[in-house]
Amino acid sequence: KAGMFGACSLCLGNKLVAWAEDVYTPESLKGINQGFPVKEAMHYKKLEDLRVECELCPRKCTIADMERGYCGVRENRGGSYYTLVHSRVCALNVDPVEKKPMFHFLPGTKAYSLATAGCNVECKFCQNWQISQYRPEQVESILLTPEDVVKDAKISGSKTIAYTYSEPVVFYEYMFDTAQLGNKHGLKSVMISNGYIQEKPLRELCQHLSAVKIDLKSFTEKFYQETCTGELKPVLNTLTTLKKVGMWFEIVMLVIPTLNDSEKEFREMCGWIKENLGPDVPIHFTRFHPTYKIKNLPPTPVKTLEMARNVALDTGLHFPYVGNVPGHEGENTYCPHCKNIVIRRAGFSILENHLKDNKCKDCDQPIPGIWA
C-alpha cells in the first residue's frame, strides 16, 4: 500500500515495509511484528500495586500492570515501564533537511529520517495518522538498531539523523541512544516534534541534539483541547526551555482555515515569540491540505499565509516563512538589515546561497543558524 513516500513508506535495501491503512482486529495481529526487543523506559516512577506514573510528557499517565499509556507504545509489565518501539522503525527515508522544515540548519544537505508508531496527542489534521495513531503491533516495522541507523546514515551521505513523521517524544529512548551514538560518529541529530514533553527529559535529550523543530499548532488552549487533545502551555514551556539551554530551534504553524487563521491570533503568537524567544527564531506558516478527520475545510488561501508572514514582520520577527507553497517568495531567507536575499529556495531546493562566513555577503549582517 502506498504511504507518504509514494510507492512505499519504508524502503531499506531489499526490505519493504508499508503502513497499515486498515483497522486491524486482534486476530489479524497474530504473527505480526513479533520478536522486537523492549527496553525499560527512562522517565517514570513506581507506585503501589504495581502501578507506574510516566514522567515523559505532560499527560503524566498512571498505568496499571499490563496496561499502556495514552501513546500506546509504553507498557507497564509487573511494575516496570517499558518502551515497545526502541529500534522498531515503521517509516524511513532520506530527505532534504528543508523538508522538515529546517531553513537555518545545514541548507542543501540530506537528513536520514525515521519514525516509529505512536503519538501523545491526536491532531485531527495529522498527515501521518497511519503511523501516529496506531499502536506498534498495528504497523509493519523493521528492526533498526542505533548502530544500524548510524551506519546507514553515513552510507546515504546524510549529515543529520532526523526523528520525525510521527512523534519522537514517544520513542524517546531510541532517539536518545541513536543521537548519542550519532554524535560520536560526526552525525548531527534533529527532533521534529509537537513539543509535548516534560522539562527534565527535554533537558537531558538536548545534550545530544543539534536542533529542534517545534509545531506550535495554535496560540489558543481551545484549539489544542478540541483539535489536538492536548494543551498549549506545555508547548510554550518547551520553547522557553529550548531558548534557555541554547538549542537552535525553528517553529512551524500549520494554518487551518477558520480554526487558527485570525490576524488576532497571529499577532498574539508573534508578540509572545518576540518577547520570550527573541526576534531571530524562524517561524514557518505552512499551508493546510484536507486530511484525516478534517476533510471539510479547503486548503489554506495563500493570501492568509502572506498575511501571517506580514504580521510576523510587522511584529519584529526577522525570519518568517511561507510553507507548502513551492516557489513563493516567502520561502527565501532575507537579511533583516539590508533586506537582500541571503538564501533563495524553490520548494526543498536551494537555488542560491549568499552566506559568507555565516553573514550576509552584502552587508556583513550575521544570520543566525547552524550553517556548517
Segments from the language model and where they lie:
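Cleavable N-terminal signal peptides
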Residues: 16-18
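Conserved AdoMet/S-adenosylmethionine-binding subsite of the radical SAM
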Residues: 143-301, 308
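N-terminal [4Fe-4S]-dependent radical SAM core
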Residues: 28-53, 59-115, 130, 341-343
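Short cysteine/histidine-rich zinc-coordinating motifs and their immediately flanking basic loops
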Residues: 66-73, 82-85, 135-139, 347-353, ...
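Short secondary-structure boundary/capping segments
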Residues: 103-104, 203, 352
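Auxiliary Fe-S-binding modules of radical SAM enzymes
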Residues: 3-13, 23-50, 54-62, 259, ...
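Twin-arginine (Tat) signal peptide motif
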Residues: 1-2, 119
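Extended interfacial segments that mediate partner engagement and assembly in macromolecular machines
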Residues: 81-164, 169, 175-176
